[in-house]
């Protein structure tokens, strides 16, 4: 659980939107009254009304943000133009320390390309980050034919 405090915001009804570095954002379906008293919004609870269809990955009573938006264009794309997969590969191939231009090269740092959040950016091999992207695209409820070129768009912005 994390708390956010808005000291200067006037009491009113606001949409609450949550975003994390390489995830599609999620927002409340309706404005939430924010004022002097604490207001609790639990985006991890699948019964919390959110804006849009399939705005989050749902597993029983829990929900999570869709991960894989490396280039932060509000879409998960594994194949084709502006693909997040290509963004991961380009980051690794262009790294100054990757002298052999290996797709198995690893970068250890906090980065939007670290989709599995293990602190390592990896394109190919065990525990790679591209599997997270492909998994979220192939298993997305709207991708009824499990196409790898399916695009998952951020519901909060539609």
Specify the residue positions occupied by each region the protein language model found.
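Cellulosome-associated attachment modules in secreted, modular CAZymes
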Residues: 1-158
